[in-house]
């Protein structure tokens, strides 16, 4: 059985492991291997500890916890970044990662449904997120969850390779 709860500081190592392994699994063939190979759980955990303890943080972190296994998924959401041209009332899912061996088992869906529930309770009326172009599994997942591409794109550079992200939105 898997349940969703707020992330706490004791979850940082597990969340970093999920995030790093999630990146390495989801983005193989999309993001340069040199970038993926350089990612470490230790470095990610150090950044996450610093970020998690930041005063005034407006983002929310959720973990999916499997009985007998601990955290197996992580989602972070909140208001759009400062200066983002989003309509009033929009929230953003910043990240969603599931342990690679549990992709397709409903863990991601549980996290996303809980995030949508909480976003509505916090007054958001829509949710946006960014998906790496070519990440077909993620695109299908979000489309099945009611998200649609809204035409906005942004570029990110990984080891001198420019990759495009697509923005997806849905009403809450």
Question: Which role fits each region the language model picked out?
Answer:
Residues 6-12, 16, 20-101, 109-114, ...:
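Acetyl-CoA-dependent GNAT
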Residues 90-91, 125-140, 144-172:
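C-terminal "cap" of GNAT-fold acetyltransferases
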Residues 1-3:
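Extreme N-terminal starter segment of soluble prokaryotic enzymes
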Residues 106:
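Conserved G/P- and acidic residue-centered "switch" motifs that form tight phosphate/ATP-binding loops
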């Amino acid at each position: 059985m898997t349940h969703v709860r707020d992330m706490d500081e004791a979850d940082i190592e597990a969340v970093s492991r999920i995030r790093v392994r999630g990146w390495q699994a989801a983005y193989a063939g999309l993001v340069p291997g040199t970038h993926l190979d350089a990612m470490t759980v230790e470095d990610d955990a150090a950044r996450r500890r610093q970020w998690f303890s930041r005063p005034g943080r407006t983002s929310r972190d959720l973990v999916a916890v499997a009985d007998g296994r601990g955290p197996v998924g992580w989602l972070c959401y909140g208001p759009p970044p400062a200066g983002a041209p989003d309509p009033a009332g929009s929230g953003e899912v910043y990240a969603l990662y599931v342990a690679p061996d549990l992709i397709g088992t409903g863990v991601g869906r549980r996290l996303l449904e809980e995030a949508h529930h909480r976003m509505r309770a916090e007054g958001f009326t829509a949710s946006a997120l960014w998906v790496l172009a070519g990440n077909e599994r993620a695109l299908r997942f979000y489309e099945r969850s009611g998200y649609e591409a809204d035409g906005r794109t942004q570029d990110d550079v990984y080891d001198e390779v420019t990759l495009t992200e697509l923005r997806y939105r849905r009403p809450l």
